[in-house]
C-alpha cells in the first residue's frame, strides 16, 4: 500500500487523498506499525502509563483491537509524554519525551501513511529524518559540491541552534 501511495503522489502532485483515516483504523496496518515499534531498542521504555512493549504484547490482539476501536470511533487521545533527562557530552542534560506504547504505534502508523505521500514533495537536497538518507549523505553531497569542477564558493557557514527543540511549543 505504501508503494501505491507513493506512486499516486508522484503521478499526480495535485492529488487529494481523501480516505487515509481508514488506513489508520486498519487492523493489519496497526499490527505492522506495532512490529516496527517492537523492533526499536526503546520498546521496553515505559511512557506515563508505565506500560512497556512486553505489557502490550501480553494482550496483543486485545490491545490492537482496543486501539483500532478508539481510532475508528475518533475517541483516541494521545497521552502526555514522560519527561526524562539524559546527560550530554558537555555535562548538560538533554530532555527527552517518552510517548506511551499506544502513542508510538499510532505515530508509526501515521508515518507509514504520510511518508510515502510527502516524500515526492520534499527537496532532493533535504536529508533530515528522511528514509534512505543520513547525515553522511548530506556531508558527501556538500563535499562533492565544494570540490567539484566549476563550483567556487566564497563562504561556508556552520551553525548550531542552541536548545532548538526546547523552544518549540
Regions found by a protein language model. Give the residues of each.
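Conserved catalytic palm subdomain of right-hand nucleotidyl-transferase polymerases, strongest
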Residues: 44-52, 97-98, 136-169
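Reverse-transcriptase-like RNA-dependent polymerase core
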Residues: 31-37, 69-92, 101, 105-114, ...
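Generic recognition of stable, solvent-exposed alpha-helical segments in well-folded globular domains
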Residues: 12-15, 19, 28, 32, ...
Amino acid at each position: 500500500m505504501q508503494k501505491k501511495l507513493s506512486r499516486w503522489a508522484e503521478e499526480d502532485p495535485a492529488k487529494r487523498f481523501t480516505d487515509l483515516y481508514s488506513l489508520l483504523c486498519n487492523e493489519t496496518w496497526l499490527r505492522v506499525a506495532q512490529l516496527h515499534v517492537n523492533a526499536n531498542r526503546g520498546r521496553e521504555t515505559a511512557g506515563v502509563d508505565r506500560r512497556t512493549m512486553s505489557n502490550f504484547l501480553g494482550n496483543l490482539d486485545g490491545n490492537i483491537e482496543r486501539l483500532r476501536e478508539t481510532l475508528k470511533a475518533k475517541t483516541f487521545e494521545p497521552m502526555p509524554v514522560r519527561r526524562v533527562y539524559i546527560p550530554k557530552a558537555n555535562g548538560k542534560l538533554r530532555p527527552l519525551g517518552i510517548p506511551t506504547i499506544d502513542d508510538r504505534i499510532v505515530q508509526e502508523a501515521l508515518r507509514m501513511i504520510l511518508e510515502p505521500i510527502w516524500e515526492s514533495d520534499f527537496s532532493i537536497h533535504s536529508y533530515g529524518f528522511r528514509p534512505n538518507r543520513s547525515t553522511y549523505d548530506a556531508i558527501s553531497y556538500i563535499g562533492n559540491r565544494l570540490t567539484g569542477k566549476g563550483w567556487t564558493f566564497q563562504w561556508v557557514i556552520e551553525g548550531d541552534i542552541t536548545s532548538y527543540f526546547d523552544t518549540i511549543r
